[in-house]
Amino acid sequence: MRTKTFLLLCIAFITLFIGVSTLQAGHYYYKQISLKDGLPSTVRCILTDKQGFVWIGTRSGLGRYDGHELKKYIHQANNPHSIPHNLIYQMIEDAQNNIWILTDKGVARYQRQSDDFFIPTDETGNNIIAYSACLTDDGVLFGSKNKIFFYNYQDTSLRLLQTFDLEPNYNVTLLNLWDKHTLLCCSRWQGLLLLDLNTGKCRRPPFDCGKEIMNVLIDSQKRIWVAPYNGGL
């Protein structure tokens, strides 16, 4: 009798455990977004914004997934409020919930109310082409070819902040703030540079990791982690 009671208790416990586990697992939902949903085969970057949308940057345009369907945004030559180009380099959301899209032909800022894009220009009226971006306390820094642009939260302006010529044709493909006035710039094929945002002076870092850099990261203790091509970490 005791054995039978023990077995019944074990079965009841296992059943209860499975039921609780099933309820907990029910909070997770997995869905594959594939070619049949309209997603191009080459995904370059992904961003989840504060409203829960998933933004997908590809070589063939921009996608926004809301959990049910994928909406596509592509360049339209006759539409000044479409993205400037279909090749997406990077996406970033700032402290004001602006979503910035960095494309091959210019930077775009998503306008939620009209569901389209604002294309900022430089002082000559040309699109601002940037390959990387990073957040600061006061705004957003954008890395271009031998140039750094800055978007100011206070007056919502996007302007040229610094130029540098230590290396010609230096495309800033990665940006990180080392401290409040020193910017760590990375070019995929031309290595790392340290740019003083106050003076505009540029120099090489006090270590050599080669010129083919895949990625770079500054941790919470201000240590720099570099991933050279085929060179470990």
What are these regions (language model features)?
Residues 1-233:
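Carboxylate-rich, polar loop motifs that coordinate divalent cations or form catalytic acidic clusters
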